[in-house]
């Protein structure tokens, strides 16, 4: 991901770009979800940097081309939360932390450990203690889960992409920790919303995967966090990519900046 400087944070990696002149707005830390890497934020990172914001994007351990460390298949949610905390610690001041999908379970848990300026949760995985949350079928453990084939990636992530764009996306996906997936799918990891002292925006994609994001769940997540909620009717799960991403970015950040201004 061609975003400023590269810095290793243990088994993770941070891509970081500072503005020419520091401004009053907090930095933004971008955290990807399962199978993805910092590359999925390329467009958002460029837009944020062009607006004069300090922006950083995280490659979690074993993602974005990083080697899988020992015990990767047995690494659960809290192991990956350590990477997010390290990313926050690498910045000079509290950040707006943006999570996508499974990253939206990691981000609030990190925000329970470090001060943040705000949380933006896009197409979020639910906390384990969300009332009414639906479990998802578990995956076999013992070895990393292979990257999703292109057609499954299309239906789950990116029904809006062309065949060429989809092939590029599928080629970048990486093996995932089954422990991480199962702790999310089995709703094993609770979050304490009272321990997060920052405004929160939950973004719902109207064309998201209904198995993992059933109708009403994203709005329920917003209520759980006492946060704001925006639904983008035509947005898929990977709303950071492909046709429409410019409109979705504008809508999301107009709402997020308004929320931060009111905080």
Where are these regions (language model features)?
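Active-site glycine-rich loops that stabilize anionic/oxyanionic intermediates
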Residues: 25, 33-37, 206-207
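Active-site loop/oxyanion-hole signature of alpha/beta-hydrolase fold enzymes
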Residues: 65-95
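Short beta-strand/loop motif that positions the catalytic acidic residue
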Residues: 196, 202-204
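Flexible "cap/lid" loop of the alpha/beta hydrolase fold
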Residues: 112-149, 182-187
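Catalytic active-site module of serine/aspartate enzymes centered on a nucleophile-bearing elbow/loop
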Residues: 228-263
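Conserved alpha/beta-hydrolase
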Residues: 47-69
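Conserved loop-alpha-helix segment in the C-terminal half of the alpha/beta-hydrolase fold
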Residues: 206-235
């Amino acid at each position: 991901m061609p975003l400023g400087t590269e810095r290793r944070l243990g088994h993770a990696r941070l891509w970081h770009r500072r503005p020419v002149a520091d401004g009053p707005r907090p930095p933004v830390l971008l955290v990807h979800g399962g199978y993805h890497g910092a590359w999925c934020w390329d467009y958002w990172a460029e837009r944020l940097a062009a607006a004069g914001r300090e922006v950083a994007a995280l490659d979690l351990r074993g993602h974005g081309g990083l080697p899988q460390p020992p015990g990767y298949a047995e690494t659960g949610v809290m192991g990956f939360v350590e990477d997010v905390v390290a990313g926050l610690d690498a910045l000079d001041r509290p950040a707006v932390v943006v999570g996508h999908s499974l990253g939206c379970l990691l981000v609030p848990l990190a925000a329970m450990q470090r001060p943040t300026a705000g949380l933006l949760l896009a197409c979020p995985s639910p906390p384990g203690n969300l009332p009414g949350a639906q479990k998802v079928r578990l995956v076999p453990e013992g070895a990393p889960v292979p990257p999703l084939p292109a057609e499954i990636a299309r239906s789950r992530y990116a029904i809006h992409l062309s065949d060429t764009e989809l092939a590029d996306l599928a080629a970048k996906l990486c093996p995932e920790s089954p422990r991480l997936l199962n702790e999310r799918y089995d709703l094993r990891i609770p979050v304490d919303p009272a321990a997060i002292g920052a405004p929160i925006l939950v973004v719902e994609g109207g064309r998201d995967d209904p198995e993992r994001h059933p109708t009403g769940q994203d709005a329920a997540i917003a209520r759980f966090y006492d946060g704001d909620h925006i639904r983008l009717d035509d947005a898929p799960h990977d709303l950071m990519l492909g046709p429409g991403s410019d409109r979705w970015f504008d809508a999301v950040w107009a709402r997020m900046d308004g929320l931060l201004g009111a905080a």
